[in-house]
Amino acid sequence: MSGIKRTIKETDPDYEDVSVALPNKRHKAIENSARDAAVQKIETIIKEQFALEMKNKEHEIEVIDQRLIEARRMMDKLRACIVANYYASAGLLKVSEGSKTCDTMVFNHPAIKKFLESPSRSSSPANQRAETPSANHSESDSLSQHNDFLSDKDNNSNMDIEERLSNNMEQRPSRNTGRDTSRITGSHKTEQRNADLTDETSRLFVKKTIVVGNVSKYIPPDKREENDQSTHKWMVYVRGSRREPSINHFVKKVWFFLHPSYKPNDLVEVREPPFHLTRRGWGEFPVRVQVHFKDSQNKRIDIIHNLKLDRTYTGLQTLGAETVVDVELHRHSLGEDCIYPQSSESDISDAPPSLPLTIPAPVKASSPIKQSHEPVPDTSVEKGFPASTEAERHTPFYALPSSLERTPTKMTTSQKVTFCSHGNSAFQPIASSCKIVPQSQVPNPESPGKSFQPITMSCKIVSGSPISTPSPSPLPRTPTSTPVHVKQGTAGSVINNPYVIMDKQPGQVIGATTPSTGSPTNKISTASQVSQGTGSPVPKIHGSSFVTSTVKQEDSLFASMPPLCPIGSHPKVQSPKPITGGLGAFTKVIIKQEPGEAPHVPATGAASQSPLPQYVTVKGGHMIAVSPQKQVITPGEGIAQSAKVQPSKVVGVPVGSALPSTVKQAVAISGGQILVAKASSSVSKAVGPKQVVTQGVAKAIVSGGGGTIVAQPVQTLTKAQVTAAGPQKSGSQGSVMATLQLPATNLANLANLPPGTKLYLTTNSKNPSGKGKLLLIPQGAILRATNNANLQSGSAASGGSGAGGGGGGGGGGGSGSGGGGSTGGGGGTAGGGTQSTAGPGGISQHLTYTSYILKQTPQGTFLVGQPSPQTSGKQLTTGSVVQGTLGVSTSSAQGQQTLKVISGQKTTLFTQAAHGGQASLMKISDSTLKTVPATSQLSKPGTTMLRVAGGVITTATSPAVALSANGPAQQSEGMAPVSSSTVSSVTKTSGQQQVCVSQATVGTCKAATPTVVSATSLVPTPNPISGKATVSGLLKIHSSQSSPQQAVLTIPSQLKPLSVNTSGGVQTILMPVNKVVQSFSTSKPPAILPVAAPTPVVPSSAPAAVAKVKTEPETPGPSCLSQEGQTAVKTEESSELGNYVIKIDHLETIQQLLTAVVKKIPLITAKSEDASCFSAKSVEQYYGWNIGKRRAAEWQRAMTMRKVLQEILEKNPRFHHLTPLKTKHIAHWCRCHGYTPPDPESLRNDGDSIEDVLTQIDSEPECPSSFSSADNLCRKLEDLQQFQKREPENEEEVDILSLSEPVKINIKKEQEEKQEEVKFYLPPTPGSEFIGDVTQKIGITLQPVALHRNVYASVVEDMILKATEQLVNDILRQALAVGYQTASHNRIPKEITVSNIHQAICNIPFLDFLTNKHMGILNEDQ
């Protein structure tokens, strides 16, 4: 615009302003004076009125004062009269009786008598009440209305008695006796009963009033700090009623949930009285106050209190509002939780009489089920216990006092985790000796509503099956209650503190166990109906076993607990033996409390039963011997609501007939933390399967009784876990992967545990979301092989339906016979998991620590091996996972081919059991790519071997000698060992499943071409086990070599004919390995690459057919089983370049070529014409994919780019000197330059460790200083000056004589009138408008360009905008790449710093105009 002169407006702009300004001023002056006048008028009126009112009030006060004086005089007179009257009458009486009997006390007027009297005389109920701990009753009495006071009187006095007692015994935590709910301690039983008659509620509960209120105070502006503009200071308090202001004797702590604007400190915990919270603020909001009671049976309550701030702005403290809540608490829970154990009566025959009672009282659940507790008579049937001695029934509830005294300090933090009475309440006791060690944990300061710390406790025995009752939990949802430390007695009379683990959902009770006395005499034989599954089994209580109890909701029937101890009346079972040794092993159990609703577990009552009867012996040290001598039945978790427990196939199992009784199955868990525990019902959640997860480095040493180690089938108890579990969500609440460091032998030992054992692992992962989580390892995840000579097919059909039970939970890094961590899934059942026996010396003691990841998918829980040390729990791309049961069972009972793959840290461990039963172990190091000669063990006949060699999997089963002919197997980089045999030996034993792994022969392949496809064949059983579905294995192998090839397991469409029906159960193991062609795998759990699919099962109609499935590399679509079509990238003649128009005239370097190519092949594009098969529509869609699909898309894009690039380099001779890049490098380049969005998982690790910061500092480049000296310039200027001085100066004057202007001849021309055509201008975009404005400011006008005749558009502006955009784009992407170089461990840089941008500008040659490179240098010098 500035090229043309601006047109002058008609009026002077300043003049206008002046004319406008004048009236404004006048208006303002008028307004101000009017306002002042109004204010003065108001002031005078107010002053007059105030003066008038003051006079009136003063007069009133004088009148009141006068009357008060008169009233006082009257009162004095009255008092004098009364006193005189009293003494006169008293004197008369005394005189008449005679002076000797005169009692001096009579002359003391009643008003002073209570001060003179000795305190012992005050025995009236009122006085007694006044001296109890809640001494403020008198105040409240006068305040409360009389009728209210009278009705309360009875229960008050009783309550106070109890409180006083409890105060005397502050040190001894205990619970009221819960067996007989009407019974309070013996001494006060009768009074209590009377009180109950008068007041219905007072028998079990006491009403307590809790008042939440707040006071606030206005902060005047002058008192505020500069940076804190809060208007008020407020305090929220929690106190009792006027009658009993102190609440500390029953409130443990209070959580205040403040407004989100107080984050990150919006949850404040106050542990000690007074429960006050003072803060500053500027607004009112509802405060959620969560009161946690000392007794864990009282559910914590939430009180919403609306914070009211001072609206008067006086600056004085004013009361805002108060919220009053009445709470019903358990009588016995008041005070310091103790009552004299005088009422031990006859029940406590085994316990020392001095024990405090720890039998919990029932809990009143605020839920649909109000447990109406009638006094339960002593008929023990009603408690679901066998009719046994009194002692047995009650001893579980008493804790040894010595243990309590030993940990007095812990007592404050570790609240007693108690147990509900087993009347009609939500659970029944599970008997077991437990050692519970309090581990006080700091509660999570973040919102307790979301993440809770686990309760940690240690259990002794690794057996027993947990319960999950969907009935509403009466327990409080305490996140951090830790159990009491109980000292262990001898095995004979072990008495233990019961404990209960509360899930934080009120609607769920996870499980409760109470130890029972260990005396073996209490075993009662059950009727043999147990085995038929018709009646409910009678539970045994045994010192070393957990007895599961399940509860039926809203039903007075109890699902009684099936025995874990021997069932005496079972026809084939030998007699039980007593426990030997003390109970010493010590295992740690962590139960994670998960939010979520209780699922309604289908009531499929069925108990899984181990193929052999087992008997758990706990030897003194760390030994759990499972002897194949006793029958064990445990219920599946799905029985939680069923009243009958039907063991699935107990009948017809020949127990012990073929078995030499000398063989014992032994598991030793030495000092390890193998975890047992109750299953939380959250495991089987239908809503979102939050899994309870895991820790524990379990070091297990296997010592076999009789030298034979036999892994036992461990049943999955989580019935509904698989069937009901929805897709795992990823993200913070997703399936957290736990890294479990397990030596190979441990898995073998774990497998020996009796069915019903729940294994939990606690996570040990680095990322915060994974810490402390628990993962339940379903037993199916541990492959088991049993020593049973007659390998029964159906004996272990888990819980009647394998699909529900272990079937889905299968797949796991468990162990088969040879002992290593076999990755067998086995559908969680003996039939599905390979059964085998190992000969003596069956396990090698070579412990390879492997990390396993427990993968929780909708299909079940998988143990996934994860060798690479740098992978965090979330990104498991590099973890090598080999899953699936690769066992081939032979018909001989002696030996069995079992295949184990243990992926260790960079090593692969092969174990196979030969026919002789010896297990051979061979370790092949994956990272040292030498040729490892296979030892002779590997070429034993009949071995099945799975080899993990640099991302290539070859599975070879050979009949007899074929493998040994193979010689030493070569393992070299990127090549698969070629195996000569493709025949797999298939043995058919009727009634037994076999899985036979056949091998697709593979030539040695280079890394660039698609490699191994290995196929599995399924051999269905001739008589299939009904109801059994097993999970197909997972395979994800990431080679640890330089090229990131991956093998992704896809479940191809060819499997569809196999249809998932549960009539015949066979394991399918599919292992397509694609190196070059990437499969896109979409599966719901995005945290892990492998796709798990529902089990393909061969229908039983063709039982003998061998289905050979050859899996091709394909891309599964969104669903696990359906394929969307094959995207094979053709490397043949078809030109990739034809699809993309890339101008290469101005490009020189490989970087520029890459940039040009990557822009044509975007990973995320909204435009459909740019989209490739792998591109996403938006970043949201891209992040919606799981990590596998994201990686695959990234890889496909890199491959397409590589091909286009290669073609450009080949076709253009001027690029011949450039070396083509590998796909991996291109993928890395795309990621570094921001063409691939970073993984959301890796963005989460917030806090960098100090090492990261240090490496970052170390790796920061020395930034060259932008300062440059001007010496050269100065020197040149001085030279120039010198040069000019040397020139002669001639100044001659010149006269100008005349100026003649040339004459212009103006010729008038007639203007030809031509018709003006209409011109169309396309509207400019906001960006080009901005460019136009900026260019006009510097004096350049950009003219619109004619696109077409009479159509104009702002093309130049658009071009400049695009060019600027590209420039900034290049700089930022280069800066990001620089940031990637400096960031540690291939992390994503948190931010791009100035130094990164400076470095980027210096790195790009054509940006030297932005640097100081050419400053102070003349053009000709360059």
Curated annotation (Swiss-Prot):
Segments carrying the region annotation (Histone H3K27cr binding) are 259-261, 282-284
**Residue ranges constituting the YEATS domain according to the UniProt record:** 200-345
**A Pfam family per the record:** 3HBD
Q: Where is this region: Disordered?
A: 117-198, 465-486, 513-540, 794-842
Q: Where is this cross-link: Glycyl lysine isopeptide (Lys-Gly) (interchain with G-Cter in SUMO2)?
A: 9, 113, 189, 370, 487, 552, 592, 649, 773, 923, 1110, 1130, 1222, 1285
Which residues are modified to Phosphoserine?
Answer: 118, 120, 157, 447, 463, 465, 471, 473, 536, 575, 627
Carrying Phosphothreonine, the residues are 407, 478, 1219
Where in the sequence does UniProt note compositional bias of the Gly residues kind?
Answer: 797-842
> Which InterPro entries does this chain map to?
YEAST_sf, YEATS, YEATS2_3HBD, YEATS_dom
- Please provide the record's keywords in A-Z order: Coiled coil, Epilepsy, Isopeptide bond, Nucleus, Phosphoprotein, Ubl conjugation
The entry's stated outcome for residue 284 to A is: Abolished binding to histone H3 crotonylated at 'Lys-27' (H3K27cr)
Q: Where is the composition biased (Basic and acidic residues)?
A: 149-165, 177-198
Q: Renumbered to this chain, where is the cross-link Glycyl lysine isopeptide (Lys-Gly) (interchain with G-Cter in SUMO1)?
A: 1110
Bias (Polar residues) occurs at 119-148, 166-176, 513-535
| GO biological process, any | regulation of cell division
User: Any coiled-coil ranges, and where?
Assistant: 47-80
Question: Which Gene Ontology CC terms are recorded?
Answer: ATAC complex; mitotic spindle; NuA4 histone acetyltransferase complex; nucleoplasm; nucleus
Membrane-spanning residues where? Answer: none
Signal sequence, renumbered to the chain: none
Q: How are the domains described in the entry?
A: The YEATS domain specifically recognizes and binds crotonylated histones.
The linked condition is: Epilepsy, familial adult myoclonic, 4: A form of familial myoclonic epilepsy, a neurologic disorder characterized by cortical hand tremors, myoclonic jerks and occasional generalized or focal seizures with a non-progressive or very slowly progressive disease course. Usually, myoclonic tremor is the presenting symptom, characterized by tremulous finger movements and myoclonic jerks of the limbs increased by action and posture. In a minority of patients, seizures are the presenting symptom. Some patients exhibit mild cognitive impairment. FAME4 inheritance is autosomal dominant.
How this chain assembles, per its entry, is: Component of the ADA2A-containing complex (ATAC), composed of KAT14, KAT2A, TADA2L, TADA3L, ZZ3, MBIP, WDR5, YEATS2, SGF29 and DR1.
**Role of this protein:** Chromatin reader component of the ATAC complex, a complex with histone acetyltransferase activity on histones H3 and H4. YEATS2 specifically recognizes and binds histone H3 crotonylated at 'Lys-27' (H3K27cr). Crotonylation marks active promoters and enhancers and confers resistance to transcriptional repressors.
Q: What is this protein called?
A: YEATS domain-containing protein 2
Source organism of this protein record: Homo sapiens
User: Source gene?
Assistant: YEATS2
